[in-house]
Amino acid sequence: MSVMDTLVSRRTYRRFAQKAVPQDVVDDIVEAVRLSSCGANRQAVRLVVVNKPEAVAKVQPLVKWAAYLPPEQGTPKADELPTLYVAVVQDTSIPGDLATDTGIALANMTLAAWDKGVGSCIMGAINKPALTQLLGIEEPQKLAFMVAFGYPAHKAHIVPLTAETGVKYYLDENRDYCVPKRSKEEIAKYL
């Protein structure tokens, strides 16, 4: 698959098959973050890998799913939950643009996972105080995001953004995600 094909097909996934993500894929996710570009090569992004079933179960009530959908549609059911979470942590003792470096790391890790057929959901609507305690994250480190991983149990595809759709994703008749995206003409100016 070409890089552009990967970018088109790597969407957010919120329902997963109950199949563990193999350790070699977890290792690729970690390696993708380790290799990430970052400002001044400061490497301030850290990870906490949560892949033991009992630990994954403790994370689940501390994250929120699919803000644009009613919970009964957007929240995965017990047999659709992710089998792996990765906490993305910023080391605030290292100066630099942590937001940009974190964004690059998030892109790398989700693309590395998707290369192996593992879907992901980057989650910012999380209970940071409770997760920080649960995951043993201490100052000067700060929890930024949780990322859910697993083998997708639904499809997701890009649709044109229109006045009718707006930016909100929605489910089609098969419970697959439709993700409106702006046109190239709307996002790029050529001089």
Give, region by region, the residue ranges found by the protein language model:
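Acidic, surface-exposed loops and disordered segments
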Residues: 1-191
